């Protein structure tokens, strides 16, 4: 099986400081992406978590392989860092076919996509990351390719221009997105297999951390792995990043073995608290509680209070706090919940705080 990544396969990463947070779910550097590839499971039996999606893919891939057909088109969606790219590689490996990888933002013209499609071999997998960012003109050429394995291309210019149909080899499109709601209905309807990836449990992350530690030749015990897992925000990418940073700490400050105490000391030094919150998370919660009496407060006021861009707060910092039940968005503004007061050790006002949020990692 060959894996080909186009030279234009990745859009430039934003340069905002918030994207370089240690607990960011997005890749922070090319070096990290290379490390992810080294740690990536190769087959479904090695893949941890996402039990429902994994079971469905096992069945659909097995059936396609049995019939020697292309797998139906697959849409993978969910928060960043949960394994969408990894699953695309696994799908190709399980099918025993080639993988061609690119991304939505860099397919600027129909000819960019046409060049890729016409070079696919029978039953190959085409992986398009950030597929919600495809331009409308590129998306239009994709429809007949997905349905009929054909594309229409224009030959010539001006009055002499004409359209011809080109037949394609049967192929499987695997699209990945963090924003399924931004997909157009015609594109979404062309995926026969749709899988939502969920946050991982601490138990699943312990297995991932333990496996990665083994591949990196890092000695780690069960309690050390659990400490990392609980601070990883339900995200394997973050778990593997924390593992590498704690490994550095253990090698310099101890005997190189990661145990609970070493993990606690390292992560405290790195400003990652027991809930996986960092300085920016706590700064936002403290601003809402101390400067605005727990809210409601508007986004622009919060942004001014903590010196951060409003878009970064809304897209990068807030989602996990809201998902974990520490912050609420209401029509009147942001409100800190009782869970936020308790986490910061602040006595909530009588009847003034939002409800206690549900906890992904309880139980």
From Swiss-Prot:
Residues 1-32 are annotated as: Disordered. Keywords: ATP-binding, Cytoplasm, DNA damage, DNA recombination, DNA repair, DNA-binding, Hydrolase, Nucleotide-binding. The keyword GTP-binding does not apply. Its main location: cytoplasm. Residues 201-271 are annotated as: Small ATPAse domain (RuvB-S). Its EC number is 3.6.4.-. Residues 13-200 are annotated as: Large ATPase domain (RuvB-L). SMART domains: AAA. SUPFAM superfamilies: P-loop containing nucleoside triphosphate hydrolases, Winged helix' DNA-binding domain. The RuvA-RuvB-RuvC complex processes Holliday junction (HJ) DNA during genetic recombination and DNA repair, while the RuvA-RuvB complex plays an important role in the rescue of blocked DNA replication forks via replication fork reversal (RFR). RuvA specifically binds to HJ cruciform DNA, conferring on it an open structure. The RuvB hexamer acts as an ATP-dependent pump, pulling dsDNA into and through the RuvAB complex. RuvB forms 2 homohexamers on either side of HJ DNA bound by 1 or 2 RuvA tetramers; 4 subunits per hexamer contact DNA at a time. This is Holliday junction branch migration complex subunit RuvB.
